[in-house]
Swiss-Prot record:
Gene3D superfamilies: Immunoglobulins. Keywords: Cytokine, Disulfide bond, Glycoprotein, Immunoglobulin domain, Secreted, Signal. It is found in: Secreted. Cytokine that can act as a growth factor for activated T and NK cells, enhance the lytic activity of NK/lymphokine-activated killer cells, and stimulate the production of IFN-gamma by resting PBMC. This is Interleukin-12 subunit beta. The keyword DNA-binding does not apply. It comes from Papio anubis. Coiled coil: none annotated. It holds the Pfam family IL12p40_C. Disulfide bonds join 50-90. SUPFAM superfamilies: Fibronectin type III, Immunoglobulin. One of its GO terms (cellular component) is extracellular space. Residues 29-106 form the Ig-like C2-type domain. It comes from the Eukaryota.
Length: 328
């Protein structure tokens, strides 16, 4: 469909009285009205047009109410608050002809509302989305938190770059965890995404952009995150930990392997490792050693444990979780 046809189709559904485009189409028959949220705010005037060739005998209702709001092919409404949002339906002779769902996006003191998601405050305040990648394959996972349990939907879009975006495909959003935090329950949602034409060895010049649309009842909010894959790398823990006590010695030879999920070849995508021996009491001082090798000799006392974690050798991204094995 050409641009002109798109414009005609758009205005056959909703006409904007505001010159600032304070209403836009989220998806078919669903529109977001952007409102400055303060006492006595004027709101936005919206003119809805029934998608039908009929001209006469048309009436309008809101949601499940049978109350007739107006008649005629168009309906003019002043949207000021959530009571003005919802699904508007035009009817004729008891038959529904078309629908338009209006959602509200609040702006208070020039700042868009962030009521739906919880601020994770890591690595900094106002962090609503967090993302990690296990390797350089272009596959990554993002997650977010909310205390809302019902009437909640999410959709995710992603690309590399914004001016000339390159494809990133994201799967379905899933509820991945539930936790109790004091008197509140916290819900973690996540999504997995894959860059369509990833080149693991290439230098990244444009960041990945992730955009999450959140809808709670009739409230719309939008959250974004921008990053390079190299900045969100967090390897899986090293695997196959082996500990072999040395004869007539308190020392032990320990070894481990790269995680299966790490990029190959390992000669190019190299890891560095942090190893430590932890006594039975967590208050005991930990002896930590850093090495690029996959083996080491350590003093491993009775009732202690040996642990190792991994990090990209050439870029200071996140360390993996610890992998551990008892000393005896």
């Amino acid at each position: 469909m050409c641009h002109q046809q798109l414009v005609i189709s758009w205005f056959s559904l909703v006409f904007l009285a505001s010159p600032l485009m304070a209403i836009w189409e989220l998806k078919k028959d669903v529109y977001v009205v952007e409102l400055d949220w303060y006492p006595d705010a004027p709101g936005e005037m919206v003119v809805l047009t029934c998608d039908t060739p009929e001209e006469d005998g048309i009436t309008w209702t809101l949601d499940q109410s049978g109350e007739v709001l107006g008649s005629g092919k168009t309906l003019t409404i002043q949207v000021k608050e959530f009571g003005d949002a919802g699904q508007y339906t035009c009817h004729k002779g008891g038959e529904a002809l078309s629908h338009s769902l209006l959602l509200l996006h609040k702006k208070e003191d020039g700042i868009w509302s962030t009521d739906v998601l919880k601020d994770q405050k890591e690595p900094k305040n106002k962090t609503f989305l967090r993302c990690e990648a296990k390797n350089y394959s272009g596959r990554f996972t993002c997650w977010w938190l909310t205390t809302i349990s019902t009437d909640l939907t999410f959709s995710v879009k992603s690309s590399r770059g914004s001016s000339n975006p390159q494809g990133v495909t994201c799967g379905a959003v899933t509820l991945s965890a539930e936790r109790v935090r004091g008197d509140n329950k916290e819900y973690e949602y996540s999504v997995e995404c894959q860059e369509d034409s990833a080149c693991p060895a290439a230098e990244e010049r444009l960041p990945i952009e992730v955009m999450v649309d959140a809808i709670h009842k009739l409230k719309y909010e939008n959250y974004t995150s921008s990053f390079f894959i190299r900045d969100i790398i967090k390897p899986d823990p090293p695997k196959n930990l082996q500990l072999k006590p040395l004869k007539n010695s308190r020392q032990a030879e320990v070894s481990w392997e790269y995680p299966d999920t790490w990029s190959t070849p390992h000669s190019y995508f190299s890891l560095t490792f942090c190893i430590q021996v932890q006594g039975k009491s967590k208050r005991e001082k930990k002896d930590r050693i850093f090495t690029d090798k996959t083996s080491a000799t350590v003093i491993c006392r009775k009732n202690a444990s040996f642990s190792v974690q991994a990090q990209d050798r050439y870029y200071s991204s996140s360390w993996s979780e610890w992998a551990s094995v008892p000393c005896s």
